[in-house]
Amino acid sequence: MRLIQTLSSCLCTGIIALFTACSQAPQSPIDSVNPFIGTGFHGHTYPGATAPYGAVQLSPDTRKGNWDACSGYHYSDSTLMGFSHTHLSGTGCIDLGDILFRPSLQTPLAFSHSDEKASPGYYSVNLREAGVLAELTTTPHVGIHLSLIHISE
């Protein structure tokens, strides 16, 4: 009887050790955030950089003037006009008079969603045709634009 208890304990310990060794490293909650949720159809959200309760919301602007342009960004678009500092998410009405920053004289700027990266407080897009890598980041009070421009000879 004692042998069966010892073997059972060893077996359970081995199974627990096996599952523990096979588990993945724990993820940060930030790794689970997808800023692109709600940027299509009629969600009226934007994927740009923002801090919780932040004063600025840096994001690309892909269209203007109609109901689908309420947040300034719509996932179905493949061109963007530039980047602005104030966006409201999910409002359903065009509500801000944004000042547009353009990293290139070309308008509109073509982009691919595979060249976009977004996480809380950060957004980047590679505008390949214009030769520009645009990065946006925020703190609670400040927004920073970085545009790396490739100059061909």
Regions found by a protein language model. Name each.
Residues M1-L11:
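Bacterial N-terminal signal peptides that target proteins for export
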Residues S9-L11, Q24, E153:
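Compositionally biased regions
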Residues A17:
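The feature marks either
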